[in-house]
C-alpha cells in the first residue's frame, strides 16, 4: 500500500520537477513547473514566494493539483494547500533546497511554505504497474 513517504520520494528523487495547477481570479486554470517538495512533521510541503501570482491564486483557491511523472509512471496529488508561517518550517525547506537561499530567507516577508491537507495522491503507470491511492 502506498504512503505519503512514497509520494515524497517520487517528488524529491524520481521526478523533482513537477507541474502545479491552480485557478486564477477569473476561474482559468494555470499550470507551472515547481521543484520543491519535502516532508516536515509528517506533512508534504512545497515552497514559493508570497509576491508571486501562484501564491495569490493559492490563497484565493487553496485546492490545487500536482502532476509529477517519469517515463510511464506518474503521481497526481490533489488537495488543499495550507500556508505555514513558522520560521522552523521555512528553515527546514530552505535547508533542504540551499540553492533557494539566493532568493529566499526564512526571516524575510516573502518566503512561504505550504503543506497539503485533505489530500489524495494517485499513482498510475502505463508500464503495467498497479495503480495506488493514498490519502492524508
Regions found by a protein language model. Give the residues of each.
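Charged, amphipathic alpha-helical segments
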Residues: 1-6, 48, 98-99
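A short, Trp-centered hydrophobic/proline-enriched beta-strand micro-motif
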Residues: 10-25, 64-66
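Structural motif
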Residues: 17, 43, 63, 74, ...
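A short mixed-secondary-structure module that forms the rim of ligand-binding clefts
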Residues: 37-71
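Charged, gly/pro-rich active-site loop segments
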Residues: 76-136
